[in-house]
């Protein structure tokens, strides 16, 4: 079998892989990139971008529900087939445009997931490929669940392609993926049950705000079952049945659809990493600050699959840039964890940046906690919103803001203001001196820094 050689071979065509590949080819290196799925990566084809297109329709319905009998006569109906057609106008062009862009740059494409043969070679499309450097940017995949019948469970890919809104659905797992789709389907008329092994939903987010969000979803018909361990899924004639254990008892719940939203894991199982001496664990490919494998100097990993990442698109792009730069110029750029906000796109939205309350109190001797329910404030009342709350964390010694957690209809935007404040080491007084538009959610942020918890 003839061996083809490249300077750089990239595995994965999402933002991280593309960014690294482009940096290398623009420096004159020969580059190839492979992907077993459509080119463009998760976010733009089957993740955050199409999700936001769909969820905005749930937002419109929810906004109308909140104002029903206050001027809105009737909550609008959503034509789901038309919505899906609109979504496809965003996702369908991505693979074609991505491939054209890469080809125009001189990058060769492979449409299969490769397997490492040894430290210097891999096999893809029946061909043996050697490279001076390999870049692994394969992202995340849904976590496999290991109980009877789990193989019939559908994932977020299926939710994004639903031909119609099911009458009933069960989600196994209440992380951000599960909560976002739970909100979307329940708002559009689906009877939703959330089954969670933990004590609450959204474990990484602030408990005070998560409780309020959970209460809103419950008021809108979502049933939460916590401390529940799934044990079996069965296909029935008209529906599916999930069996779970809770408080020592075996219980069941039935629905037309049952989804696996129990988290995502690095997509590395099928790469045969052990053949190439590439070390990895549950966090992904183990890398140093240069995004270089700790066990193989000619391998770099970036994006969700690296051990230094979070499942956030801006971070993937940054890591791809650093990996590409270091391949071209030698290890000169180090990855330093930037301040990255995160958002759960429910209604209300839950957003977070900086330290949690627990993290702040473990890092600083004294922490001021500004915490409150803002549901009686003007901006919430004019929307007839069911919840609006916040928690802001301040280092008492320096008076600098070190963490912010928001629950509101505009949290995905207003959290960026706190991101800017923390990045610029702003104190509470600095922040209060700023002038924002009024009346706006941005202006509310200053009022959050008045009364300590």
Q: Model features per residue range: what roles?
A:
Residues 9-11, 114, 129-139, 172, ...:
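Short hydrophobic core segments
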Residues 150-166, 252-329:
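FAD-site-proximal beta/loop scaffold in flavoenzymes
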Residues 2-14, 165-172:
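Beta1/beta-strand and adjacent pyrophosphate-binding region of the FAD-binding site
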Residues 2-6, 22-165, 193, 198-202, ...:
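Glycine-rich flavin
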Residues 48, 138-191, 195, 223-224, ...:
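Glycine-rich dinucleotide-binding loop and its adjacent helix/turn
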Residues 302-359, 438-453:
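A conserved FAD-binding loop/helix module that cradles the flavin
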Residues 9-16, 20-37, 49, 53-60, ...:
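Flexible, glycine-rich terminal cap/loop adjacent to redox cofactors
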Residues 125-127, 230-231, 244-252, 264:
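A structured beta-alpha segment of the ubiquitous adenosine-cofactor-binding alpha/beta core
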